[in-house]
From Swiss-Prot:
Keywords: ATP-binding, Cell cycle, Cell division, Cell shape, Cell wall biogenesis/degradation, Cytoplasm, Ligase, Nucleotide-binding, Peptidoglycan synthesis. This is UDP-N-acetylmuramoylalanine--D-glutamate ligase. Its EC number is 6.3.2.9. Pathway: Cell wall biogenesis; peptidoglycan biosynthesis. ATP binds at residues 122-128.
Amino acid sequence: MANLIATDNPIVVVGMGLTGLSVARYLANKGANFFLLDTRKDLPKSTWQQVAELQAKCPSMKVDNGSLDVELLTSAKQIVLSPGVPLATPEIQQAKAAGVEIIGDIDLFLAERKAPVVGITGSNGKSTVTTLVGLAAENAGMNVAVGGNIGVPVLDLLADADVELYVLELSSFQLESVKRAQLDVACVLNVSPDHMDRYPSLAHYCQAKQRIYFGAKKIVYNLEDTLTIPPVMAGVERYGFSSKKAVEENEKHVLLNNDTNALSLNGQDVFSVADIKIAGAHNLKNALAALAICDAANIPFAGLKQALQEFEGLPHRCQWVANKNGVTYINDSKATNIGSAQAAIEGLAGQFKNIVLIAGGDGKGADFSSLGKVINQYVSAVVLIGVDAPKIQAVVDPQVMCVKAQTLNAAVKQAALLAKSGDLVLLSPACASLDMFANYEARGHEFALTVAEVSA
């Protein structure tokens, strides 16, 4: 992608979050002429500290916040859009109509990277699978860099010139502005309703996810999820993965062999389900996806086997917290959408006598009907919190006990009263946390702290 760094007209970086600041550092190092904008009037002190450091290094950089200057945007050579700023923003659309090129940090990264890139997206499981693939490569002795939507912004990964493989978690927000991904391996794990406050429909959200496929050399997709099926593209290798569905014989595939209880690649068992340390049916699917990706990316399977045997899961993703009076407490605060919560409930069902679910928060415009069906099938009681608690309650059948709590602290204590020995208290909100907390991590920490207060 030639000449992504314009010199005759200014580049405008929109957004001063983690990604926007990484773009600004990258452009400053290139000696580019650029503006740094943000729509927010009030920015954190830490942001201004980083901006001051950038201005000291790049005095020509201009900064503005509180609104988007249409005249500046429409006269720019390029706009580098941060993931938190929708492509549909009116000022951005005006610039696009004026012929301004709009790109994201992924485009800048791909234009400069020297090593193969694996990109992983999906409504849920992408952080876990990205971590597993990264660990597999590391265990195999490769110099691997992991980042994107998880941890380090992609442009910061370029600092190490000796990287042999990049493994990136990519969100729909990041993929919106990608012109052509051109990944070596591209994977969509699953698609379920999320960010319906940003996308007009599930179809639009799905289209954003599938942008990861365009230009990819190899594609990995979920045979059980029709929304992940890629378009037919000549010369592209396809890998399907599934825990229960058969495939066409001419397609590469990773399946669960029920006869041997093993994960198999193209009909050959690779390793046992018993090798997977992280629990739940949803994590079995994550392992299947990781195996398909490792094969596509030429990562030795021994590295993945070690990762699966040792990896205990990420914080706030179906994380075991405690067992008190025979009741298990699991923190799945990262379940910020319906699909993720459903995966946790279905994946853990059958391992406990009953599930007492804590759910609720900001549903981001989601339709909770499908969640209601899963709750009605697997959950004995629900404690609801947050602004969208009434919407969830509306889809829960009367036979499922449903109570509301004003705080998460109160919800945990209420759930502890409802649970008996052999039961599970599961925090899997199916909602964002911003109506009550700074982020899902803060919500998860509050859950763990309150569990510690519950009488042993």
